[in-house]
Amino acid sequence: MKLICGLGNPGKEYEHTRHNVGFMLIDSYLGVEKMSEKFNGLFIQKIIDGEKVLFLKPQSYMNLSGNVVRPFVDYYKIDTEDILIIRDDLDLPLGRVRIKRDSSSGGDNGIKSIISTLGSQNFYQFKVGISNDKNRDTKDYVLGKFSKEEMKILDEVIGDSRSLIDAFIHGQIVSTTDRNYGEKK
């Protein structure tokens, strides 16, 4: 079984914020699907091309994501290399996507929490660049909404994320996948 977890913060006030890119990609992939609730997470189990896949959106705050991910991993007996965590990344430019396995937290507290509770960083991270506005407080920036121009770039990322998620499900993802969207041609 594969686990695909999108990180974000629960609640209407956080919808469409930079920190909720993980939720946005999960929602886009699934479309309008009713998710069940367990272990403080919204989840749905699907069979995609014969592969069992668990989609998860933790309903704790980002910094406590590991407390939600770990019970699902234990309950469903999921190997860490079968986990994909979708998250925002301040250190990547807006529109850059990077997928890496066995990577550190890079300062992301949600990933730190997951590494701590799993006792391993041997999982895939699907990092979506949101840039970093050094002129703004980091917390205010990541909890801020995307501008219309930024959303155009993010829409490209979201549109292509399905193929990257499918590649993970089918065991065809390359650990160093790196793509750019929204660049001037």
What positions do the PLM features span?
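Hydrophobic alpha-helical segments within soluble ligand-binding/sensing domains
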Residues: 107-110
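Nucleotide and nucleotide-moiety/phosphate-recognizing core
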Residues: 2-102, 112, 116, 120-126, ...
